[in-house]
UniProtKB/Swiss-Prot annotation:
Alphabetized UniProt keyword annotations: ATP-binding, Cytoplasm, DNA damage, DNA repair, DNA replication, DNA-binding, Nucleotide-binding, SOS response
Family: Belongs to the RecF family.
Task of the protein: The RecF protein is involved in DNA metabolism; it is required for DNA replication and normal SOS inducibility. RecF binds preferentially to single-stranded, linear DNA. It also seems to bind ATP.
Highest taxon, organism lineage: Bacteria
Entry-linked Pfam families: SMC_N
Main location per the UniProt record: cytoplasm
A single BP term in Gene Ontology: double-strand break repair
Name of the protein in its database record: DNA replication and repair protein RecF
UniProt-listed InterPro entries: DNA-binding_RecF, DNA-binding_RecF_CS, P-loop_NTPase, RecF/RecN/SMC_N, RecF_2
């Protein structure tokens, strides 16, 4: 799959942008704060109906305007897809795929797939479990609508369970009904996450080995607060029962997929706690490029690769690995110059100079 064309109107600092993209490498160069990342953000938004930089959609609208527009034409093996999104200042959005209105965000997932790699992705390793859960959830949602709908349902039931826990008129019988529903969704979520981690381990072993010239081994381990061998549902129900007193005191559900995490080990050392910044960056790179392989395995097409100002952050080995993988993958890169890229550009590649929200060449 690849993006054939992109159109932006009143999106951040772009009043009007219309571009035809290459199936291969597309490079947006320019000084900082000129609008390079805004192009990548708009593409990401069309895949997930949300920005990777802000939770406030109104931030995406040019400050002089009341609405912004994004339109993508995506080429796929079977059928081209046109995605049109209108973002309103009141927080609402209207999404159409091939002129058909999308009523639920989950219906958008999988229309086309992206993998983004940016300097902020170091947070996946360095910061809280919530960021690592978000990584897993976003990757799984774009390849499985069933995962998305189970996740939405789980969070809905979880919120309702927490309301019951805090209620003065606490009813244990009602709580047990919610527990059974919660366990059903959780069972699916955890099993899908475990399978995804297994796939990252499979592909990540080869990717990490190539980046480090065989000097390091990497392992990803899912960390669930629910210990089980075969019957996850039973184990989770027992945990909910055992934690009931504490959950009532705190007014929250203290265990479940919403509290899970995963650990990254390089040569049996916890990378979050003891890894160097270079090792942490390599771990993220391994995760992201494993996701490329996983999406290709499942959808039979490579996703679009978005590289947001990361090349300057990578040492020569990591940079060489990234640039050597660009064959057969539409890649959209932002950077301040193309010196590092010249050997990897061909006749199909396109380079766009960005200056204050305009393409100047």
């Amino acid at each position: 799959m690849y993006i054939k064309a992109i159109m932006l109107a009143n999106y951040r600092n772009y009043n009007n942008l219309e571009l035809n993209l290459s199936e291969g490498v597309n490079v947006f160069i320019g000084d900082n704060a000129q609008g390079k990342t805004n192009v990548l953000e708009s593409i990401y938004y069309c895949a997930f109906a949300k920005s990777h930089r802000t939770s406030r959609d109104k931030d995406l609208i040019n400050w002089k305007e009341n609405e912004a527009y994004i339109s993508l034409l995506v080429g796929k093996k079977r059928l081209d897809k046109r995605i049109d999104i209108k973002i309103l200042r009141d927080g609402k959005k209207a999404i159409k795929v091939n002129s058909i209105k999308i009523n639920k965000i989950g219906e958008l997932f999988g229309t086309f797939n992206v993998v983004m790699f940016s300097p902020e992705d170091l947070k996946i390793i360095k910061e809280s479990p919530g960021i690592r859960r978000k990584f897993l959830d976003m990757e799984l949602c774009q390849i499985s609508k069933k995962y998305y709908f189970n996740l939405v349902q789980y969070n809905k039931i979880l919120n309702e369970r927490n309301v019951i826990l805090r209620s003065r008129d606490f009813n244990k019988d009602i709580l047990e009904v919610y527990d059974l529903q919660l366990v059903e969704c959780a069972d699916y979520i955890v099993k899908e996450r475990l399978e995804y981690i297994d796939k990252i381990n499979y592909y990540g072993k080869f990717i990490h080995n190539e980046i480090t010239s065989g000097k390091e081994d990497i392992v990803f381990k899912y960390d669930s607060g629910i210990k089980f061998k075969d019957d996850f549902k039973y184990a989770f129900l027992e945990k909910l029962k055992n934690n009931l007193l504490r959950d009532r005191e705190q007014g929250i559900t203290s265990i479940g997929p919403h509290r899970d995490d995963f650990n990254v080990l390089i040569n049996n050392i916890d990378v979050k706690k003891f890894g160097s910044q270079g090792q942490q960056r390599t771990a993220v790179l391994t995760m992201k490029f494993s996701s490329l392989k996983i999406i290709k395995e499942i959808t039979k097409e490579y996703p679009i690769l978005l590289l947001d100002d990361v090349l300057s952050e990578l040492d020569i080995n990591r940079k060489r690995y990234v640039l050597s993988t660009l064959n057969d993958i539409q890649t959209i890169i932002t950077c301040t110059g193309i010196n590092d890229l010249e050997d990897y550009l061909d006749d199909k590649s396109k380079v766009f100079k960005v200056c204050n929200g305009e393409i100047v060449n």
